[in-house]
A protein has these predicted regions:
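Expand to "…catalyze enediolate/carbanion chemistry for C-C bond making/breaking, isomerization
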Residues: 4, 34, 103, 131, ...
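Short Gly/Pro-enriched loop/turn and capping motifs at secondary-structure junctions
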Residues: 64-66, 101-104, 124-125
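Loop/helix-junction capping segments adjacent to catalytic residues or to phosphate/diphosphate-binding pockets
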Residues: 18-19, 45, 104, 127-131
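Conserved, mostly hydrophobic/aromatic
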Residues: 58, 83, 99, 110, ...
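Acidic, divalent-metal-coordinating active-site segment for phosphoryl/phosphodiester hydrolysis
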Residues: 101-113
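C-terminal helical cap(s) of enzyme catalytic domains, especially alpha/beta-barrels
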Residues: 111, 125-146
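Conserved anion-binding
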Residues: 1-95
Length: 146
C-alpha cells in the first residue's frame, strides 16, 4: 500500500467542482494523510475558499507550474496575505506554502507575507554550495520565526 509512505497528498485540480474536490480531500484524510491544494497564478483564492476549512496546506504557485528557473511573481503574495487573513478570521489550521522562483531575496518576501513553507528547487540545486544555501535559507527562516 503506497499510502503508508506518504504523510500528505497535494491536489492540483483543473476544471473540477469543489464538492468533488472535498470528496477527494475526505478520502485523503481517511487514509491518515494531510491534504493540500495548489493554486496556480491565474486562480483566485475565492475559487477554493469553501475548501479551506478542510485543508492542511495551500500551495501558492508564484510561477506557472512545470518549468524550473522562472521569475518569481511577486503579485502572488497578495494571495498569501489573503490566506493568512482567512486563516486568522476563521481559525483555520492550514500551512501556506510558496513554490516558484524562490531565492535568497524572494524567500524574505514570502515569509514577510505570511508563508511558512517554501519550495526552492532551482535556488538550492543550482547553488555552487548546496549546504551553504540550505543553511542560508534556514537562517532567514529563523529571522522570521519559522
Amino acid at each position: 500500500d503506497i499510502v503508508k509512505y506518504y504523510d500528505g497528498l497535494l491536489l492540483r485540480v483543473p476544471n473540477r467542482q469543489n464538492p468533488e474536490i472535498l470528496e477527494e480531500v475526505d478520502k485523503i484524510k481517511k487514509c491518515g494523510m494531510k491534504a493540500a491544494i495548489a493554486v496556480k497564478p491565474a486562480t483566485p483564492i475565492s475559487e477554493i475558499k469553501d475548501l479551506l476549512s478542510e485543508l492542511d496546506m495551500v500551495l501558492v504557485m508564484t510561477v506557472e507550474p512545470g518549468f524550473g528557473g522562472q521569475k518569481f511573481m511577486e503579485e502572488q503574495m497578495e494571495k498569501v496575505k489573503e490566506l493568512v487573513k482567512l486563516r486568522e478570521e476563521n481559525n483555520y489550521k492550514y500551512d501556506i506554502e510558496v513554490d516558484g522562483g524562490v531565492n535568497p531575496e524572494t524567500i524574505k518576501t514570502c515569509f514577510a507575507s505570511g508563508a511558512n513553507v517554501i519550495v526552492a528547487g532551482s535556488a538550492v540545486l543550482g547553488a555552487k554550495d548546496i549546504s551553504a544555501r540550505v543553511e542560508e535559507f534556514a537562517q532567514i527562516a529563523k529571522e522570521y520565526n519559522i
